[in-house]
A protein has these predicted regions:
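Internal "kinase-insert"/substrate-recognition segments embedded within catalytic cores
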Residues: 1-97, 101-102
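Extracellular/luminal Pro/Thr/Ser-rich low-complexity repeat and linker "mucin-like" segments
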Residues: 153-154, 234-247
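Conserved beta-strand and immediately adjacent loop positions that scaffold enzyme active sites
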Residues: 115, 127, 288
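Short secondary-structure boundary/capping segments
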Residues: 5-10, 117, 143-146
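Short, surface-exposed recognition loops and adjoining beta-strand edges that mediate ligand/DNA contacts
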Residues: 78-91, 95, 100, 109-124, ...
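Long, low-complexity serine/threonine/glycine- and acidic-rich segments characteristic of extracellular
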Residues: 241, 245-312
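Short, compositionally biased P/S/T/A/G/V-rich stretches that sit at domain boundaries
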Residues: 214-238, 311-314
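C-terminal catalytic region of ATP-dependent kinase domains
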Residues: 103, 109, 119-224
């Protein structure tokens, strides 16, 4: 933990596993249920600790931040601001995108409430950490998100789903079918195991990339093919502030105005955005609206020209 996170051992690490209940006095009969993000109508950690196993700071036995999260999800009493304060949207969506793409059915974001770690750095936000991903690349028709309690409640919110779509699109366009980077990696792996009796089944993965592509595009849906477009008309105005509306495809992480760092972008759906607080000077304004990726690199740009007229005299 300390290798990957600053003071990582001071955070809360939970291992996700089945909950088991013994149903007979002799211990021979038992029942299990998947771990999930359900709230059990109790803030008592005993209700959660058998499927969310404490693996750091065990002596503290502090489940308060975890229970705060599942209570918000389970009661559906959260909005974008409050849930993003508790949960690391990007880390959760990256994990779900990868495990969904490779059809890792044996984990919590798909069909089994286990085989992952849930981690919260001290003073930070909850994230899923990959673990035990050996049931992969099998069923190209597998779902990308499962139906365990709380999973869809979180990931189907448009302000979360947009980021899941984005990271899945990153996989599709950069790291899977026809990816030079992945082809180079597979070649190096082939050379590394030569003569060992181990074979690198590159053809299996190439076939997977081809067969999984359409399913991934269908899961993303219309955002995969939405145009990058400004919908606001450029009629002359006397206002000093401007708001623009538009749409973007799933290749775009955020929207900005070149040179205007105070402008704020708000997403109203998985594709529609509103950019407010744009400052206008008197005369013609040549604005550049930029769609950027998670690294701030420009993916799309479109010019928007608008004239600000002089204010009318009182």
């Amino acid at each position: 933990m300390n290798r990957n996170f600053e003071n990582g051992s001071e955070g809360t690490l939970l291992r996700v596993d089945d909950e088991w209940r013994f149903t007979s006095d002799d211990g021979n009969a038992r029942q299990s249920r998947n771990a999930d993000w359900s709230y059990k109508n109790s803030d008592n950690p005993v209700q959660y600790h058998s499927e969310w196993l404490m693996r750091s700071r065990e002596q503290d036995y502090d489940y308060s931040n975890f229970i705060e999260f599942v209570k918000a999800i389970g009661t559906r009493k959260f909005d974008e601001e409050s849930i993003n304060r508790m949960a690391d949207r990007d880390m959760l969506c990256i994990n779900a995108a990868v495990r969904g793409y490779d059809a890792d059915w044996d984990t919590i974001t798909l069909n089994r409430g286990k085989n992952a770690y849930f981690y919260r750095p001290k003073g930070g936000k909850w994230m899923l950490i990959h673990w035990d991903g050996d049931r992969v690349f099998g069923n190209a028709g597998e779902t990308f998100l499962g139906g365990l309690s709380g999973i869809r409640t979180y990931f189907d919110k448009p302000y979360i789903r947009r980021h899941l779509n984005y990271y899945l699109t990153e996989l599709l366009t950069k790291l899977t079918k026809d990816s030079a980077l992945t082809e180079a990696w597979m070649q190096f792996e082939t050379e590394a195991v030569a003569g060992t009796g181990i074979s690198m089944t590159s053809s299996h993965y190439r076939n997977w990339f081809r067969s999984r592509e359409r399913a991934a595009q269908n899961f993303i849906g219309s955002p995969f093919r939405t145009d990058f477009k400004i919908n606001t008309r450029n009629s002359p105005t006397t206002n000093s502030d401007l708001t623009l509306n538009g749409t973007s495809p799933s290749t775009v992480y955020d929207i900005r105005i070149a040179g205007q760092f105070a402008a704020q972008c708000e997403w109203t759906s998985t594709t529609a955005w509103t950019l407010s607080g744009i400052k206008l000077k008197e005369g013609q304004n040549d604005l550049i609206v930029e769609g950027v990726n998670h690294e701030g690199k420009i993916v799309y740009s479109e010019e928007f020209k608008i004239t600000k007229r002089a204010d009318s005299p009182p």
